């Protein structure tokens, strides 16, 4: 850990293996959470996504979230048969599919950092939330606006503001 990183970032990294701001660094590429395609700095992530993220990341992400693949497809509004075919052939994901999975990975990391417990994080992500219009946080990650709303809600929780 660098000396110039805030203490909260250091505590979150120590507890969850993921930085508090949800950014996956190079050291997290081999961590139990996170996808190598989404690891590194922003330019690495962009390069990886432009060259195509393999569909075989989906089962691991679903497992980390504690949902089935079908449940993940439904929550993120991903086409079920297309995703199943991509996974079985280990094809690359489309840009919109990658974006949804990237947002999901970042929100999972942020949720783990804020709630500091994997079981609590998984439960929070799939439970309907009044603050989010009665939707589960994962169900909002199909859009950028929903992603921002979920991150804002996590920020409120982190700072003790009623969310």
Locate the predicted segments by residue:
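Non-transmembrane "mature" sequence context
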Residues: 1-163
């Amino acid at each position: 850990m660098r000396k110039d990183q805030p203490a909260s970032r250091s505590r979150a990294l120590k507890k969850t293996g993921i930085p508090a701001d949800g950014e996956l660094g190079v050291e997290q590429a081999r961590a139990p959470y996170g996808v190598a395609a989404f690891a590194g700095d922003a330019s690495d992530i962009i390069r990886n996504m432009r060259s195509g993220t393999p569909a075989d990341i989906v089962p691991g992400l679903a497992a980390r979230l504690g949902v089935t693949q079908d449940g993940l497809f439904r929550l993120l509004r991903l086409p079920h048969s297309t995703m199943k075919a991509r996974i079985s052939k280990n094809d690359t994901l489309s840009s919109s599919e990658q974006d949804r999975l990237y947002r999901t990975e970042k929100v999972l990391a942020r949720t783990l950092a804020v709630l500091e417990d994997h079981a609590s994080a998984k439960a929070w992500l799939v439970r309907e939330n009044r603050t989010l219009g009665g939707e589960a946080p994962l169900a909002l990650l199909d859009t950028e606006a929903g992603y921002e709303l979920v991150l804002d809600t996590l920020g409120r929780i982190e700072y003790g503001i009623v969310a």
